Amino acid sequence: MQSDKSKALIDSITLSINNLATMTDATVKSALFKDWLRAVSRFHHYSFNNQLLVLLQRPQAERVAGFHTWKSLGRNVKKGAKGIAILAPCVRKQTVEEADILRTGERGSAMRLCGFRVTHVFDIADTEGKPLPELEHRAQAGGDSLLPRLERAAAAMGIVMEYREVTGSKNGWSEGGKVVVNATLSTPAKCGTLAHELAHEYLHWQSNRRDDMTREQRELEAEATSFAVLAHFGVEQPSDRYLASWDATAESITASLHTIRDAVHHILGVMDSECQAETEIEEIAA
């Protein structure tokens, strides 16, 4: 059973998507889309709906967590701080009959989603206590160390990397299992190009979606994904293409936003895993 509070939150999400779809001001539309991408970059572990809810209520939020999670990290929520309302799933055990597994001869029970409840998280600005080393590390990762991390992520995704001097205006391209980046680019430009092409590989080659999409839609998804991946490390690309010229319905926008969110979560997850493995190797060597 859905509560009135959770229904109100879901309605606010639907309204924000509809507003984006019907917006005619290209500049404002692009700015709103980039705001959402920044939210994805900060909260990529959160669901699509909760990312939007955090953005709608606290656009400047940097890192959010529940009251007890902050306490476990050595930080306390400040007195009088206002929480950010998000949705948490309500689950219960279902019977064998409900799961319709009697015919298979199996026994036991499974979990069933029976709705959502409203819970609250707090931004780091609403807390005080021990500093978080992870945020300091993330801030440092935006320099020259970002490119090697992207390269290791490519290898972990099974993608062959090649730097090649390219004539003309192309910065790079993906070939389905291989990415070529213009060797004459600056390090920041290499980062942007590599992140963009990794997005193409994951979104369009590895998923076999490439032939079912227009070139414009493929470029939109790849550019948006790379923007969010780099923004996670404090690097922003100077691009305003995004949704500004994208004529789409609320349904198609929602589908693409879900896809972009999943791609960002996957690529950042690979980068985090590779960074952790690298740290463990350094500790062993020391």
PLM features: residue spans?
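N-terminal accessory/interface modules of nucleic-acid-binding and processing proteins
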Residues: 1-286
